[in-house]
């Protein structure tokens, strides 16, 4: 058994404990939490805050490493770097590609998950079944959903396929949405100009997320709310959002998080090798199109707190909400029975002081 004592615990579900607080870890799980005097032998973390490890459900790359193209060893090393930085679970994300390219990419990512099963929850396929708001996705690669191809992919890779972003207009009749959701794959709506009613219809067919709210979708208009309006108001849909201050104005980030306590913050981080260039926390194609961010999950949390969101709530958007959105219900919480993926933070700056994965310290 390992015990940790800190000033307070941010539970991941929006709560903050009394002070002092402690937790006990056994066999990779949190077995007890409490306040007041800590168990004998507890490691004293002083005035630190303990919180769940951060969860990123949309990360395309890190540094110079593109998760769709790099080698297994390169991807593992990049994910390890992000884990040491406080992100203890993630979904490596693949953007639109020719259908015959997916087997090679997924074979590599299956090997990555085999090497890091405690960290890699699965894979997020962002495309190629996208619609009228392609963003950085090459339009020539976009296509109507191929239900048989998706079924074959899920048969081959099983629960490696954790999340699929598609556009309702690329899934007429919602066959792909229904088929994926029936298999336990989370379906997100994105890169779409679908109208409000169409977005609701897709949610009724099984979609439960809206990928990077306000980006890759039609605008929010007071008479035509579109996908943004559905993501903000139709409760079966949970919005994710990139809080770098570039993809979405900070005022609208705050609006979205206030409107949807269950919203998820993501990095949408990409590799910053040519032709992608990084500037002010965002990544751009040569023509100026936004291609993602260069955030870490801890950066994302700190930026949300800078908007006036309380730390416990910012942590919820980056932990419990993210894990719940993809069915990883034993993560993202500091509570008995949850996985012992925990971070320690400075109480004033939220700088990282320590990381534990499966109860093992990485520092």
Question: Which sequence ranges carry the predicted segments?
Answer:
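N-terminal metal-binding scaffold of metallo-dependent hydrolase/deaminase domains
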Residues: 1-38, 360
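Residue-level marker for buried hydrophobic side chains located in beta-strands
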Residues: 3, 53-55, 123, 188, ...
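Active-site gating loops and adjacent loop-to-helix segments of metal-dependent hydrolytic enzymes
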Residues: 57-60, 80-91, 131-158, 200-213, ...
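Divalent metal-dependent hydrolysis catalytic cores, especially in the metallo-beta-lactamase
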Residues: 60-62, 76-105, 118-132, 157-171, ...
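Conserved, mostly hydrophobic/aromatic
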Residues: 125, 180, 210, 304, ...
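Active-site core of metal-dependent hydrolases
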Residues: 150, 155-273
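His/Asp/Glu-enriched, well-ordered alpha-helical/loop segment
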Residues: 230-238, 259-345
């Amino acid at each position: 058994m390992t015990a940790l004592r800190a000033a307070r615990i941010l539970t991941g579900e929006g709560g903050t404990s009394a002070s002092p607080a402690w937790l006990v870890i056994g066999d990779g799980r949190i077995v007890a939490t409490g306040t007041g005097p800590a168990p004998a032998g507890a490691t004293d973390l002083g005035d630190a805050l303990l919180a769940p490890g951060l969860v990123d459900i949309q990360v395309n790359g890190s540094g110079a490493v593109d998760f769709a193209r790099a080698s297994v060893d390169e991807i593992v090393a990049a994910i390890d770097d992000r884990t040491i930085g406080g992100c203890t679970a993630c979904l490596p994300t693949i953007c639109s590609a020719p259908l015959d390219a997916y087997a090679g990419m997924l074979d590599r990512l299956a090997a990555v998950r085999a090497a890091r099963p405690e960290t890699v929850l699965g894979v997020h396929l962002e495309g190629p079944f996208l619609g009228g708001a392609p963003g950085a996705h090459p339009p020539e690669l976009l296509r109507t959903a191929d239900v048989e191809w998706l079924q074959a992919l899920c048969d081959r890779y099983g629960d490696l396929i954790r999340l699929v972003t598609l556009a309702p207009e690329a899934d007429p009749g919602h066959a792909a949405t229904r088929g994926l959701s029936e298999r336990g794959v989370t379906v997100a709506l994105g890169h779409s100009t679908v109208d409000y009613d169409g977005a609701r219809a897709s949610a009724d067919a099984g979609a439960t997320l809206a990928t990077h709210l306000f980006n890759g979708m039609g605008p929010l208009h007071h008479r035509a709310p579109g996908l943004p309006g559905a993501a903000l108001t139709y409760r079966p849909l949970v919005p994710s959002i990139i809080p770098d201050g570039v993809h979405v104005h900070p005022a609208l980030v705050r609006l979205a998080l206030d409107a949807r306590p269950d919203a998820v913050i993501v990095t949408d981080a990409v590799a910053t090798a040519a032709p992608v260039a990084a500037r002010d926390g965002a990544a751009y194609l040569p023509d100026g199109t936004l291609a993602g961010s260069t955030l870490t999950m801890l950066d994302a949390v700190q930026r949300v707190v800078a908007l006036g969101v309380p730390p416990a709530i910012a942590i919820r958007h980056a932990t419990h909400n993210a894990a719940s959105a993809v069915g990883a219900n034993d993560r993202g919480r500091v509570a008995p029975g949850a996985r012992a993926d925990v971070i320690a933070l400075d109480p004033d700056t939220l700088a990282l002081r320590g990381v534990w994965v499966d109860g093992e310290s990485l520092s």
